[in-house]
């Protein structure tokens, strides 16, 4: 279609058409006006891959490492490449808009979506978000910065009031958005669910209009988070352009009435529509047809990029006695619950059906030239493992039949609406549609055959947003239809997992029937949570095994093994949108397993997968420790590349790992209490707190070792002359450093530039990260690198009395760090205190 003449189109639109354009028509699409050639636009999650339009039975996609993993790369060029591939993935899914990146701030290790954001530091997070967005938009696809702002916990996320000082709001929580905008003016911004200082962000004029649009000069489209609109006139007047998803709750006839009664001025309505039409023009060059089919790419070059990203994200936490890299020629024992599980992404909006996955065991097995043995050690599932992949259909296919009916199972002569073949026994039905379904209330029979490999008692579990009963050979084993209890699955809208058990015989085939009723059939109290459409289901099973038996077997094998690697950590069950973790600990039994293995084999390598910090009570015992995050499709290969030395680890922690949860500055203020959460740590988030109170964490922000060694030398600073007021350039300061690879293997060094302020009018952090760069060096190679920072950004704090940034006069110390202990120091002066606003 030709580009729209926006102003002419606004004149030609009726009020009804304008109103329609300001709300989605379904979960993933905007409204169209065919008579004026205004097309519908498609959008898709999100943070670590482009899922497409279906949670349920969707088209597979590339899964990138989670955001904290990408944050650990500290690599803007890599993030730019990843953004470009995300753009291409979006086009393949027929999507004009990607709902990401996420750049909230991890004020606590417990945040359910902490893995979705890059870092606890605004400079690192903002620059990486800027470059990934730049890559996305270079492909013509619109990127969406989210969640604007202070959506830093899941507990009562739609109702909680985040009470935060203006200084902390500016210096910590808005800063990553501000810095990302300086690199890439994203086409879209998504508002947060929560309130900030008393007002929901989606109707907060100060945040949307005064700061984002006027102060920062941004002119894109502001959309709500899903069901995160809470008013008609207030939201429109504050600057919320688009309510998502459809069908609308707050616009439609209510908005038309508000305009006709001057609760919303017509020129304000036109502003909202103008931003929608400008977005249509922004993505016009994609030439994606309406209702485009969703396709898969999965090209060899994409797989190579995903593998490189997974390997670059791995952080070498410890490597005493050079235990790593391992020897491919030697035999190896692989232990642990994450060994044969592909923990490739977190849960919620970030989850997707990956093209393929590689488990750590598969990655190690592919590279080892010696014998590879396995021992489970412990299981770490929160809910019972999915039963679907263990089932067979009547004709021998893996999986089960999925039969949809309008009528309850008790009714005779039910009409079969649709039959599907599924493998996963976890389904979120919010985007499942069939024209024969009469309402949100319908029923599904899922049938398959289960043949156990071992005798024993088997536990079965059912979690639903709705109701569910599980039968084995006609016997009711699990009933989750009455007296339901609130759980955490499916964005916090599901029941807890109800369980039952049955003794089964190896080799005998049993008929499994799971009968599901959609969300309206539930008696669960869902106040305070979002129930997405028809709801969802999950059913699983596992043979009951004693933990001591598993650990003892692993310990015995470890005592005899030539090389041992233990894979433990979290999965999307433990870290997910919808709820926060209750603690920082690994799943039950994991710490005991690791500790006992280290007792008999001190050279065992420990690999932890999680998107956010975990406690490690055995950390002093281990000589070799890797942190591997949720690594995407190529997770297992990326880890194995580092374990065996094909890739020299270069990752640095983007978040602080405290010794214990109580050490974290948000410990006493991390949940909603009486409808609010107090950001009591103020600007002292993450490393800013630990350094201010001189409290040693387990592993600090920026930590990460290498298989080689580096030196940094010859620090010089080049400054520009001061002017009476800061101009747009911000008076650049260029730091030049010589970096030398003094070891025997090639590797990448991350050079970090920190600025320590002089004594000023207010308390400030000891030092703050202001810039960084990554450089690859062959053994013995030396390179000069430059880091450019703006004086106004490097020196300023937010003055609440003046409501401006303050760059106070004085001498500022520059500290340059990297791998190892060495610190280079220099300084520069600010001759005169200056105040400023803007981007």
Curated annotation (Swiss-Prot):
Its EC number is 3.2.1.21. One of its GO terms (molecular function) is beta-glucosidase activity. Pathway: Glycan metabolism; cellulose degradation. PROSITE patterns: GLYCOSYL_HYDROL_F3 (PS00775), PA14 (PS51820). InterPro entries: Cellulose_deg_GH3 (IPR050288), Fn3-like (IPR026891), Glyco_hydro_3_AS (IPR019800), Glyco_hydro_3_C (IPR002772), Glyco_hydro_3_C_sf (IPR036881), Glyco_hydro_3_N (IPR001764), Glyco_hydro_3_N_sf (IPR036962), Glycoside_hydrolase_SF (IPR017853). SUPFAM superfamilies: (Trans)glycosidases, Beta-D-glucan exohydrolase, C-terminal domain. GO terms for biological process: cellulose catabolic process. Keywords: Carbohydrate metabolism, Cellulose degradation, Glycoprotein, Glycosidase, Hydrolase, Polysaccharide degradation, Secreted. It catalyses: Hydrolysis of terminal, non-reducing beta-D-glucosyl residues with release of beta-D-glucose. Its main location: secreted. Beta-glucosidases are one of a number of cellulolytic enzymes involved in the degradation of cellulosic biomass. Catalyzes the last step releasing glucose from the inhibitory cellobiose. Belongs to the glycosyl hydrolase 3 family. This is Probable beta-glucosidase I. It comes from Aspergillus oryzae (strain ATCC 42149 / RIB 40). The lineage of its organism: Eukaryota, Fungi, Dikarya, Ascomycota, Pezizomycotina.
